[in-house]
Amino acid sequence: MLYRSALRASRSFTPRLASTNSRLVSSLVFLEHKAGKLNEASLSAVTAAKTLGNDTHGLLVGTKSEIENVLDRTKEIKDLSKIYLATSDTYSHSLAEPLASLLASIASAKDVSHIFAAHTAVGKNIFPRLAGLLDTSLIADIIALESSGDTFTRPIYAGNAVLTIKSSPKDSVKVVTVRSTAFDKAAVANGSAAVEDVDIITVDTPTQFVSEELTVSSRPDLASAARVVSGGRALKSKESFDTILDPLADSLGAAVGASRAAVDAGYADNSLQVGQTGKVVAPELYVAIGISGAIQHLAGMKESKMIIAINKDPDAPIFQVADVGLVADLFESVPQLVKEIDNVKV
């Protein structure tokens, strides 16, 4: 594996933070939520933050009704000692500019040493801006960190190498996104976090919310599902993708995923893509159907606890990481597998 350390050069500009005589003693976790539910990936970010041994605080933002829907459960998170609330319509759609300014303000006012978020679409949108406002490095997609708080590990080259990063002492606030599959979820039980309101920060921004289209599915969320069934280009068409994968996913209670080749061919929506440029998953069970196993796809699923691969090519790279491999025609074997599963369930 490749290891490399990097120290940033000193800067001529110092961000407006708490007094240099103040002791930076707490970590802050940005807690995502949507439609009245806390994003499970944020619980992994809490676990990462707790590694440092500091007081760990959470931040909930949104309208009054949005916060009320998730506050009770959030207070139950065992590893949080305090929850900051920023209640305003300004934060109702998670626009990056106002949220980055809010986080920067809290970092200055609350003696924060580290700010964490899950490495999700929301985190990846907000945290680069936050790092810019604080004139600090963004440390993205970490899979480990040391209790010292200045050394982090992240994958590079599609997961084929690991980079060790030592942040500069000039970065008095560390801005970090966390790969959720690399950390256990913080327990949501017996917590007793205190609640504190924070000031709303108003910023002028050219970005305005226009609309949002959400895909409604009865299946588990792909990023956090315990079981995932993914299909590749070998399914040959969108119709086959749906008719072959959906029954198996329904039988297993699984989420549906897709390789980049299947997405590019129009078989599946981009939101289902698993891989280096898609979602990174680590379910208990991952079933790869008609997926050859390109390195970009493996980067998004190789940490799965159990991998089952079905492919008619015995030399397909996917078999090198699979725990169970079946060399067979997917159009025959998958329907038969569904029948067997349903028979067992009966």
From Swiss-Prot:
SUPFAM superfamilies named in the record: Adenine nucleotide alpha hydrolases-like, DHS-like NAD/FAD-binding domain
SMART domains for this protein: ETF
Note describing how the cofactor binds: Binds 1 FAD per dimer.
Location in the cell: Mitochondrion matrix
GO biological process, one term: fatty acid beta-oxidation using acyl-CoA dehydrogenase
Residue positions binding FAD: 285-313
GO molecular function terms listed in the Swiss-Prot or TrEMBL record: electron transfer activity; flavin adenine dinucleotide binding
Protein's UniProt keywords contain Transit peptide: yes
GO terms for cellular component: mitochondrial matrix; mitochondrion
Record key words, sorted: Electron transport, FAD, Flavoprotein, Mitochondrion, Transit peptide, Transport
Keyword Transport attached: yes
Cofactor(s) the record lists: FAD
Family statement drawn from the similarity comment of this UniProt entry: Belongs to the ETF alpha-subunit/FixB family.
UniProt subunit comment: Heterodimer of an alpha and a beta subunit.
Record function comment: The electron transfer flavoprotein serves as a specific electron acceptor for several dehydrogenases, including five acyl-CoA dehydrogenases, glutaryl-CoA and sarcosine dehydrogenase. It transfers the electrons to the main mitochondrial respiratory chain via ETF-ubiquinone oxidoreductase (ETF dehydrogenase).
Protein name: Probable electron transfer flavoprotein subunit alpha, mitochondrial
Organism: Cryptococcus neoformans var. neoformans serotype D (strain JEC21 / ATCC MYA-565)
Organism classification: Eukaryota, Fungi, Dikarya, Basidiomycota, Agaricomycotina
Gene this protein is translated from: ETF1
